[in-house]
Amino acid sequence: MKMPKTIGLVHFIGIGGIGMSGIAEVLHNLGHRVQGSDQADSANVQRLREKGISISIGHKAENLGDAEVVVVSTAIKKDNPELIAAREKFLPVVRRAEMLAELMRFRNAIAIGGTHGKTTTTSMVAALLDAGGLDPTVINGGIINAYGTNARMGAGEWMVVEADESDGTFLKLPADIAVVTNIDPEHLDHYGSFDAVRAAFRQFVENVPFYGFGVLCLDHPEVQSMVGKIEDRKVVTYGENPQADVRFHNIRMDGATSIFDIEIRRRRTGQVIEIKDLRLPMPGRHNVSNATAAVAVAQRLGIKPEDIARGLATFGGVKRRFTLTGEWNGARIFDDYGHHPVEIRAVLRAAREACQGRIVAVHQPHRYSRLSSLFEDFTSCFNDADTILLAPVYAAGEEAIEGVSSEALVDRIKAAGHRDARHVPGQEALAPVIAKIAQPGDFVVLLGAGSITYWAAALPKQLAEISGNRA
């Protein structure tokens, strides 16, 4: 049974969240009555309001109104007044992933999973399906620049969704195609052990129906190990590994554009298809790998090589994924969501490949628990940066942990041999430091999942004001 149109008014608690807003938008576009609330106004809230969705700022029991269904994310705590009121009224309370799963039942679905790279890969798969004329519905974990939103209602039979593994609910998603980009020890507070994370991703792939398939990255040792354990389901592998079914090679750079070739091998027939000189307007081997995952999906869905090439060449990227926010004195300033050592290392390596000058990395660690559990990994992930500026930890509601701080990380990075690592006490201190060290041709890359995105947006203007005052 598919979700009927008669479910009544749907209320989203925390509707401005990146995952919740996309689901709310698609539900609204399908003709359902949708409303919601959020703690603060935001771009997502404004976008939904412009579509006619009523949104209250602040959480109060009366916000429910005539709601007959309530949708919550894992960020909503049990003492939320709206959640308490919903249960007192005996209303059905639906987890975000459950509602996403209901939407997926209306389409053939592609779910993109992995510890890193999900948002970009979801966007790339959507771009290639668009280029192939399949007009997909998309629900993503980031703003797709081509759409100006994280969700889009298509007329075609396919849906592309980002599968969030953080709380295990991605196992509820009824995907026909499951993509796994990588598996790293994240979200151990939920899973308890890395073995449990591994088991969840294996289940994610084995959940696809017999007529579906998994798309797995053979370059990542954890994913490669999982390939041989997948039972009774088709698997397509991709990566730079010569054994991959869909293999990228011959990477070159043209400024910030990656150029590469792809070789597609069909195991049963031995047929080999080559697509040469693909152009992707993003630097970095990790982005080429993500693009190859998208190609692996697209070619299985019958999209022609010339459409694949066009879709990649015109790919507009994702907000907060190496996003240029401005220039100052010939130095370029970028904003990136990277907050895990694996992500930071990949972003800075990509910056190194594209940059003619020096790399200045500005990082705001996100959560004390993450910095504590991955402290040693953080000491080496900035190696491609010439200068490292570390801001105070963005707590995200956590209590501080003794001995875990940006200052301690600076000391450890220096002890490990880095020549220029510094602590920056806050946003107001950043622009004066950058003004002294940034030179023409340099990249200034701000990284983190917290408020540092606002620093990145404001920095070009702050630098211009400093240079104007000097004049």
Swiss-Prot record:
It catalyses: UDP-N-acetyl-alpha-D-muramate + L-alanine + ATP = UDP-N-acetyl-alpha-D-muramoyl-L-alanine + ADP + phosphate + H(+). It is found in: Cytoplasm. One of its GO terms (cellular component) is cytoplasm. InterPro entries: Mur-like_cat_sf (IPR036565), Mur_ligase_C (IPR004101), Mur_ligase_C_dom_sf (IPR036615), Mur_ligase_cen (IPR013221), Mur_ligase_N (IPR000713), MurCDEF_pg_biosynth (IPR050061), UDP-N-AcMur_Ala_ligase_MurC (IPR005758). Pathway: Cell wall biogenesis; peptidoglycan biosynthesis. GO terms for biological process: cell division; cell wall organization; peptidoglycan biosynthetic process; regulation of cell shape. NCBIfam families: murC. This is UDP-N-acetylmuramate--L-alanine ligase.
